[in-house]
Amino acid sequence: MSKSTSKILVIDDDPDFVAAVTPILKSALYEVVAASNPKEAKEKIFAEKPDLILLDIMMDSLFDGFSLCHAIKTSKEFKDYKDTPVIFVSAVKEIAGTRFQFKGDEEGMAGPDDYIDKPVKPDDLLARIARLLKQ
């Protein structure tokens, strides 16, 4: 898949993060679509058919990102998008002293394809996206 035709959906309730990451993605010729909450994200997934999703873990509640990722990867509602790569982004590296680690579907929760800490490093973000879009 050519990155010049790839569409990335950025799902984050922080408008500053969306404003910061959008020019990074556009500089690499990605088309960028944004959503600020899970409800809007679902609408954008169906309307825009993204090639990759950048998903904030914590939005209105702690589990919004986890729940949405699990739905995308496993529910019948999103069956056409279950193979869409999802990268979690978050400023929170730990909850109760436990570092986030994602190795696939553990304990019934389908995880993301990758994880990146905020603030993102542009080169690192673009390299991860390119790797996932080539799979």
Task: Show the residue positions of the predicted features.
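Acidic catalytic/metal-coordinating carboxylates
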Residues: 36-40, 63-70
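Alpha4 helix (beta4-alpha4-beta5 surface) of REC/receiver domains from two-component response regulators
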Residues: 63-67, 77, 82, 92-116, ...
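Active-site residues of response regulator receiver
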Residues: 56-57
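Two-component/phosphorelay signaling modules centered on CheY-like receiver
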Residues: 15-33
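Acidic, metal-coordinating helix/loop segments flanking the phosphotransfer/catalytic sites
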Residues: 34-52
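Non-catalytic signal-transmission and effector/linker regions of two-component phosphorelay proteins
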Residues: 1-7, 80, 117, 121-135
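Acidic di-acidic motifs
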Residues: 12-13, 118
